[in-house]
């Protein structure tokens, strides 16, 4: 049986980490692509040389021509410029929109049947533009954000309560940025909602709000520490979880930036919501009830994403 083919478009820190993780999980053969000739080839060879030690079978190749991604089952897009200290994700819009146009054309020509996961920032606007540039069905193009944001929230909660991360579930809605909406009411420790843990005296409302704010600032905190780039281990792990759910038809319930067609009162936009990912791509968008405060926060986040999409249209009118 032929192995799956995974194309990694962008071979920077996230791209290299994606290749290593995909190899370790034996998700398929891996092609690293980058316009910087030599980088994808070198990283591919380096990771391939780790396979006898780590005991995985996968062909890893690198290329600087889009024809190398031909027939890919999954494309994970990290191409673009990363954040530097003092920058918001939104500051990257103009540069990375042009990159998405090139990537979209490459996927359209060589991998029109792929499941596409976008990681490039500003995420919600870039995945929206990428879907339009590629012409792929909206359920086959998705943005990696919610899995990462929820993972950060879960870690901070586990540390606060001194429990295993495996026993913490967390929900983050909305855009992948300063207006994201971590939902305490739908987040649990051992099945107990955070709101109940406040009542039980495990944590104060004020401390919980501090953890929520740290989650919102999670990416910026790492950018500030690294000084020369942005996070890559956790984003790569998050995208691989999504790719695995698609390739193995696991039907995982994962929060991600999905195309909405009226759910949550949003049309023709990509916003972070809980989804079911299986062999059909995004097979279902799960609509949860939001109270007044949560709805206001979500609507504010949606408005921020809408503003970015409008900015994209001003740069590339063909997106309208």
From Swiss-Prot:
EC number of the protein: 1.1.1.37
Keywords carried by this UniProt record: NAD, Oxidoreductase, Tricarboxylic acid cycle
GO molecular function: L-lactate dehydrogenase activity; L-malate dehydrogenase (NAD+) activity
Catalysis performed (reactions): (S)-malate + NAD(+) = oxaloacetate + NADH + H(+)
Residues bound to NAD(+): 10-15, 34, 96, 119-121
One of the Pfam families matching this protein, by short name: Ldh_1_N
Keyword Electron transport: no
Database matches in PANTHER family: L-2-HYDROXYCARBOXYLATE DEHYDROGENASE (NAD(P)(+)), L-LACTATE DEHYDROGENASE
Classification lineage: Bacteria, Pseudomonadati, Pseudomonadota, Alphaproteobacteria, Hyphomicrobiales
SUPFAM superfamilies from the UniProt entry: LDH C-terminal domain-like, NAD(P)-binding Rossmann-fold domains
Full protein name: Malate dehydrogenase
């Amino acid at each position: 049986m032929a192995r799956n083919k995974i194309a990694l478009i962008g071979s920077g820190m996230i791209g290299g980490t994606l290749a290593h993780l995909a190899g370790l999980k034996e998700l398929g053969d891996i092609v690293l692509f980058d316009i910087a000739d030599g980088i994808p080839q070198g990283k591919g060879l380096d990771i391939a040389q780790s396979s006898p030690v780590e005991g995985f079978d996968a062909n890893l190749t690198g290329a600087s021509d889009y024809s190398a991604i031909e027939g890919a089952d999954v494309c994970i897009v990290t191409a673009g410029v990363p954040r530097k200290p003092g920058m918001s994700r939104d500051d990257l819009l103009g540069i990375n929109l042009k990159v998405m146009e090139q990537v979209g054309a490459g996927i359209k020509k060589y991998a029109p049947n792929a499941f596409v996961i976008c990681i490039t920032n500003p995420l919600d606007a870039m995945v929206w533009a990428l879907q339009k540039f590629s012409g792929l069905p909206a359920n086959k193009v998705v943005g990696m954000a919610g899995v990462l944001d929820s993972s950060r929230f879960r870690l901070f909660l586990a540390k606060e309560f001194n429990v295993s991360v495996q026993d913490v579930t967390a929900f983050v809605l909305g855009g992948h940025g300063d207006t994201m909406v971590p939902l305490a009411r739908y987040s649990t420790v051992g099945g107990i909602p955070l709101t109940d843990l406040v009542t039980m005296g495990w944590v104060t409302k004020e401390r919980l709000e501090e953890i929520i704010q740290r989650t919102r600032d999670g990416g910026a905190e790492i950018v500030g520490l690294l000084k020369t780039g942005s996070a890559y281990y956790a984003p790569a792990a998050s995208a691989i979880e999504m790719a695995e759910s698609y390739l193995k038809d696991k039907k995982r319930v994962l929060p991600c930036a999905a195309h909405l067609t009226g759910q949550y009162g949003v049309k023709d936009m990509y916003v972070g919501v809980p989804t079911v990912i299986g062999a059909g791509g995004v097979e279902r968008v799960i609509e949860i009830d939001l109270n007044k405060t949560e709805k206001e926060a979500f609507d504010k986040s949606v408005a921020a994403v809408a503003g970015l999409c409008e900015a994209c249209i001003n740069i590339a009118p063909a997106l309208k």
